[in-house]
UniProtKB/Swiss-Prot annotation:
Organismal lineage: Bacteria, Bacillati, Bacillota, Bacilli, Bacillales
Membrane-related topology note: Peripheral membrane protein
Gene Ontology biological process terms from the UniProt entry: intracellular protein transmembrane transport; protein import; protein targeting; protein transport by the Sec complex
Protein name: Protein translocase subunit SecA 1
GO molecular function: ATP binding; metal ion binding; protein-exporting ATPase activity
UniProt xrefs under PROSITE patterns: SECA, SECA_MOTOR_DEAD
Organism per entry: Staphylococcus aureus (strain MRSA252)
Basic and acidic residues bias spans: 799-813
NCBIfam families named in the record: PRK09200.1, secA
Assigned protein family: Belongs to the SecA family.
Length: 843
């Protein structure tokens, strides 16, 4: 209890401080009101000029803190003149919390959009760009258009970044003082910027300050979904079809086991026997059958754990993922690890080729790159620990401008879903007769359509808002508060759009919100409730539950069922109990805790790839931005030569074997015959380096003489292609490592530590391979002067072909690996089986 009171005291103390600063802003109202429009714009110019003279971000932030009251007062006055709306004190307080890099939790209808204008204006003065982020492109478009009036009045520029825009249009949007965009588009633009070949092809500026609307949706709900840019991998789809046919034949408990709580599914011994007969293999779990078992497991997941119209939808022959938190489809997103292909096989649509990841990043890692990050939402307090631990953001609950009058009624619990839905329909019919508008919230598209059919049978006119008709979202939400309106909505419930009450609705009790099921996250339930009772309006909310709801099944509805049977309750009689409501909330807390742990675990694993990504992207960018890349090439030539000497030459031996070293030098650096055993015999490692280096330098100079001024362009092209090719393969290898690493825990090993160590080794090997390839292609490529190497356009993602190199004679050429005699996981096994080491003696 002490911990809770500390948090509450902390919030109260914070609110007092925000209130004092807000009063300073309000105190400047009269002084600002006498300024002309031109004088207001001149103030903006003055601030910008003073900030431009400060080159340090921290000092700029100190200056912004100093001018905050005056800047916020200017925005208030501008808002009054442009929109005829003056931000309230609580909105100023929310704006101050955002400027501090925190999350302002503000109830629905409290004017978050207007609140954000103050910190956006203030931080845009620094000239480093402010990103205002919304959950969809519709909201970005609407808000940028509306708010541009205010920002332009104040003397700032506004850009809108959409998926459909060209590279030039995107660059222009990012160059403005303020840029509106979705989180997805920002992430993809960042990845694309790190795949270009020339600096002028980039569209973004360095990441400075971001304000995220519906911050919980983006930083919590979508945190586990990585953004991926991929190219097609060549792979047959026939195994998906076979696995799908097999999965259809299986029976639960006999052939496979399914755990409802963890949503995991696996074959029984009997199921494995059937698989061996069906796929004509002797031992299903033999390493050579890893593809077969992988496809079977994926097909089982597609059939058993994922439901059509709940987890995904099929639209025009295409499988679209449904976002579990918003109810919207996510075009362009695909399940990974072959799961999407397994669903396509299940639904009988065309199976797309598997894709190969070329670049990826999670929102957790993308947003942590900003100098300052802030957000706003109606529901964030339940996830405060996660915001603090992962993003270093505090959640500040901003008071409402008017007291909340909504009546949140106790949950009603029924034995069956039929009893629950019958009661829901009766409640809707009763309220509809009185003219009170009703918003029905559902967890899945399937449920919204089922209730819609029940209401049609009763002759109740209504609108359905789900992933199938999201185009009319704004129109449906706008009418949801009118007299007699009945609206069914999935979780999306029109986030970002207010439901305003029509004439005479206040007298009828305001908007009635009915939840047909509890979501696994309390925030989503709070969001649904929050649709009603905006800005002090009247309203009420109630959730109808059944013991057959997924959340209840997952967390022990058997005890409740027995209790209701003992009480002799039938299907039409609900129980209304604080104990049950507490049990439901406890189940939700457990799920939230599990989800937080999962996101934290993902971040720990992703941290390994984040550091590696940072090194690769920095390397790429320095190659692109440097006018001369010869220093990079020189360093690579030297380190590759030194590594090969360390690996092959053992001067302690009485009779060292020089031929493998010479073969390697011929393969990577020189033409055959350029170096002989006589050149290096009897010399120590240092002298050998000098002898060979002189020959390499001469070969390098020869290429420079042939290509002259085109040499730099040629080197850049080779460097970037080599980095991109190996980095893409490395991402794939790291993904494979991660998929199987959890099994290490059964051998009393620490999977995370193993992943970190092996990931580091794989990265070292990749860097060596990049250097080796670069050396080989720069020294051994045969380029004619008349080839006229042109600047290479950034090609379609996924394609990167090397300049053809002279191969010389066919022979076995060993590669130097720094780790002594250790063999890499993806190298051929030394036993000569032809398998990769990880699938043979490396198991």
């Amino acid at each position: 209890m002490g911990f809770l009171s500390k948090i509450l005291d902390g919030n109260n103390k914070e609110i007092k401080q925000l209130g004092k600063l807000a009063d300073k802003v309000i105190a400047l109202e009269e002084k600002t009101a006498i300024l002309t429009d031109e004088e207001i714009r001149n103030k903006t110019k003055q601030f910008q000029t003073e900030l431009a003279d400060i080159d340090n971000v921290k000092k700029q932030n100190d200056y912004l803190d100093k001018i905050l009251p005056e800047a916020y007062a200017l925005v208030r006055e501008g808002s009054k003149r442009v929109f005829n709306m003056t931000p309230y004190k609580v909105q100023i307080m929310g704006g101050i919390a955002i400027h501090k890099g925190d999350i302002a939790e503000m109830r629905t209808g409290e004017g978050k959009t207007l609140t954000a204008t103050m910190p956006t204006y203030l931080n845009a003065l620094a000239g480093r760009g402010v990103h205002v982020i919304t959950v969809n492109e519709y909201l970005s478009s609407v808000q940028s258009e509306e708010m541009a009036e205010l920002y332009n009045f104040l003397g700032l520029t506004v850009g809108l970044n959409l998926n459909s825009k060209t590279t030039e249009e995107k660059r222009e949007a990012y160059a403005q003082d303020i840029t509106y965009s979705t989180n997805n588009e920002l992430g993809f633009d960042y990845l694309r910027d790190n795949m270009v070949n020339y600096s002028e092809d980039r569209v973004m500026r360095p990441l400075h300050f971001a304000i995220i609307d519906e911050v919980d949706s983006i930083l919590i709900d979508e945190a586990r979904t990585p953004l991926i840019i991929s190219g097609e991998a060549e792979k047959s789809t026939s195994l998906y079809t076979q696995a799908n046919v097999f999965a259809k034949m299986l029976k639960q408990d006999e052939d496979y086991k399914y755990d409802e709580k963890t949503k995991s599914v696996h074959l029984t011994e009997q199921g494995a026997d059937k698989a061996e007969r069906m796929f004509k293999v002797e031992n299903l779990y033999d390493v050579q059958n890893v593809d077969v078992i992988s496809h079977i497991n994926t097909a089982l997941r597609a059939h058993v754990t994922l439901q059509r119209d709940v987890d995904y939808m099929v639209v025009d022959g295409e499988v679209l993922i449904v976002d579990q938190f918003t109810g919207r489809t996510m075009p362009g997103r695909r399940f990974s690890e072959g799961l999407h292909q397994a669903i396509e096989a299940k639904e009988g649509v065309q199976i797309q080729n598997e894709s190969k990841t070329m670049a990826s990043i999670t929102f957790q890692n993308y947003f942590r790159m900003y100098n300052k990050l802030a957000g706003m939402t109606g529901t964030a307090k339940t996830e405060e620990e996660e915001f603090r631990n992962i993003y270093n953001m505090t959640v500040t609950q901003i008071p409402t401008n008017k007291p909340v009058q909504r009546n949140d009624k106790s949950d009603l619990i029924y034995i069956s879903q039929k009893g629950k839905f019958d009661a829901v329909v009766e409640d809707v019919v009763e309220k509809h007769k009185a003219g009170q508008p009703v918003l029905l919230g559902t967890v899945a598209v399937e449920t919204s359509e089922y209730i819609s059919n029940l209401l049609k049978k009763r002759g109740i006119r209504h609108d359905v808002l789900n992933a199938k008709n999201h185009e009319r979202e704004a129109e449906i939400v706008a009418g949801a508060g009118q007299k007699g309106a009945v609206t069914i909505a999935t979780n999306m419930a029109g986030r970002g759009t207010d439901i305003k009450l029509g004439e005479g609705v206040e007298e009828l009790g305001g908007l009635a919100v009915i939840g047909t099921e509890r979501h696994e996250s309390r925030r989503i339930d709070d969001q649904l409730r929050g649709r009603s009772g905006r800005q002090g309006d009247k309203g009420d909310s109630r959730f109808y539950l059944s013991l057959q709801d997924e959340l209840m099944i997952r967390f022990g509805s058997e005890r409740l069922q027995k209790m209701m049977s003992r009480l002799g309750l039938d299907d039409s009689t609900p129980i209304e109990s604080k104990m049950v409501s507490r049990a439901v909330e406890s189940a939700q807390k457990r799920v939230e805790g599990n989800n937080f742990d999962a996101r934290k675990r993902i971040l720990e694993y992703d941290e390994v790839l984040r550091k590696q990504r940072e090194i690769i992207y920095n390397e790429r960018n320095s190659i692109i931005d440097e006018e001369d890349s010869s220093q990079v090439v020189d360093a690579m030539l030297r380190s590759t030569l030194q590594r090969s000497i360390n690996y092959y030459i053992n001067t302690a031996d009485d009779e060292p074997e020089y031929q493998p070293f010479i073969d390697y030098i011929n393969d990577i650096f020189l033409q055959e015959g350029d170096i002989t055993e006589d050149d290096i015999k009897g010399k120590d490692a240092e002298d050998i380096f000098e002898v060979v280096w002189a020959k390499i330098e001469a070969a390098y100079q020869s290429q420079k003489d042939i290509l002259e001024e085109q040499m730099n362009e040629f080197e850049r092209m080779i460097l970037l292609r080599s980095i991109d090719s190996h980095w893409t393969d490395h991402i794939d290898t790291m993904d494979q490592l991660r998929q199987g690493i959890h099994l290490r825990s059964y051998a009393q090993q620490n999977p995370l530590r193993d992943y970190q160590n092996e990931g580091h080794e794989l990265f070292d090997i990749m860097m060596q391979n990049i250097e080796e390839d670069t050396c080989k292609f720069i020294l051994k490529s045969v380029v004619q002067v008349e080839d006229n190497i042109e600047r290479e356009k950034t090609t379609e993602f996924g394609e990167a072909k090397h300049v053809s190199a002279e191969d010389g004679k066919e022979k076995v050429k060993p590669k130097p690996i720094v780790k002594g005699d250790q063999v890499g996981r993806n190298d051929d096994c030394p036993c000569g089986s032809g398998k990769k080491f990880k699938n043979c003696h490396g198991k």
